[in-house]
Each structure stands twice: as structure tokens, then as C-alpha cells.
């Protein structure tokens, strides 16, 4: 503890984030993505209705031995762990451990993470590093977007002049997944 300047103890509960229920379009998109998934893949699922819909499809499927390497761990991953889909057994980096940088979800998710040795919380500079992701065999990054043009270019931050979200790790994960074996 010699490198710590201050320690502040608190018994204030962690903030929770409600799980966004997918809409009909989210479900349709997830159904189009699902056939491309294979046993043993390492997943990064973004945030929103479509990744939640895909997580539900995976939880009810025959897929097995999936891995987790993600910026944001949410209740969608908890559902996959509870269904026995994520084992991290086939990962080529941090085998046996799901890796994440930040977490937001339910109290149940926080309880699951508490002293869970099969989960590794790492700095964002590591988790979001495309060079690190490139070391993961069968790594796939699945994110949602707000809009797409006819060329397939996506926008995941704004709609017209209305800002919806900030720049997250989506580009890092797309680059990392593209570089992965």
C-alpha cells in the first residue's frame, strides 16, 4: 500500500444500470448475426438492445466454451455465464479468465464478480489495445450502431446534430478483431 496516497472506505451501494430490452429490429439483427458464431470464440458484445438480444440467443443455444474479452461487462455476460456458455477454456490469452475493463449492471452482476477468480479486471489501456486483441484466436467484436449509410459506414455516437454517446472502444475492438487470428 506504499504507492497509494489515499484510501476512502464507503458503504454506499454501487450504482446499477437497468438492462435494455431489445426491440424487434434488435432481435432481427441478432438473428442475422447468430449463424456466424462458433464454439470456442472469444466475444466482445457492445452495449444496447442488439447485443442483449444476441446474448439471449447465445444463452439459449448449443454454443459452448465461449470466451469474454470486453471493455464493458454487463448483465448480458452474466446471463451467458449462468447458462454455462462462457468458460474461457479455449482462449489463447488469459485462458480460463474472462477479461473486462469496466462494469455496469445489476447487484447480482456485482455479487458474481466479487472475489471471482475466473474474472480479470484490467486497465482499459490493456483491454482496449488492438495489439492485445490480435493475440486472441477466434475473437469477434459485435457492436450496435445508431445509423448506417448505403456504403456500410456506421455512426455509433450521434444522430444528426444530437449527441447520443461518447467515443468508446468500438474502433479499438473492430481493429483488434480484424487483426485477430
Predicted regions and their residues:
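Conserved phosphate- and dinucleotide-binding cores of soluble alpha/beta proteins
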Residues: 1-181
Amino acid at each position: 500500500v506504499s504507492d497509494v496516497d489515499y484510501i476512502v472506505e464507503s458503504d454506499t451501494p454501487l450504482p446499477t444500470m437497468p438492462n435494455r430490452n431489445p426491440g424487434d429490429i434488435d432481435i432481427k439483427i441478432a438473428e442475422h448475426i447468430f449463424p456466424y458464431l462458433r464454439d470456442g470464440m472469444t466475444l466482445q458484445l457492445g452495449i444496447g438492445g442488439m447485443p442483449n438480444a444476441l446474448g439471449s440467443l447465445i444463452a439459449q443455444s448449443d454454443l459452448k466454451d465461449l470466451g469474454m474479452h470486453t471493455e464493458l461487462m454487463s448483465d448480458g455476460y452474466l446471463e451467458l455465464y449462468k447458462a454455462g456458455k462462457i468458460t474461457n477454456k479455449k482462449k489463447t490469452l488469459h485462458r480460463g479468465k474472462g477479461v473486462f475493463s469496466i462494469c455496469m449492471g445489476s447487484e447480482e452482476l456485482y455479487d458474481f464478480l466479487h472475489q471471482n477468480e475466473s474474472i480479470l479486471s484490467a486497465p482499459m489501456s490493456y483491454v482496449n489495445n488492438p495489439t492485445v486483441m490480435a493475440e486472441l484466436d477466434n475473437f469477434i467484436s459485435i457492436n450496435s450502431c445508431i445509423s448506417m449509410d448505403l456504403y456500410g459506414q456506421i455512426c455509433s455516437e450521434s444522430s444528426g446534430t444530437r449527441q447520443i454517446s461518447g467515443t468508446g472502444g468500438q474502433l479499438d475492438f473492430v481493429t483488434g478483431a480484424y487483426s485477430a487470428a
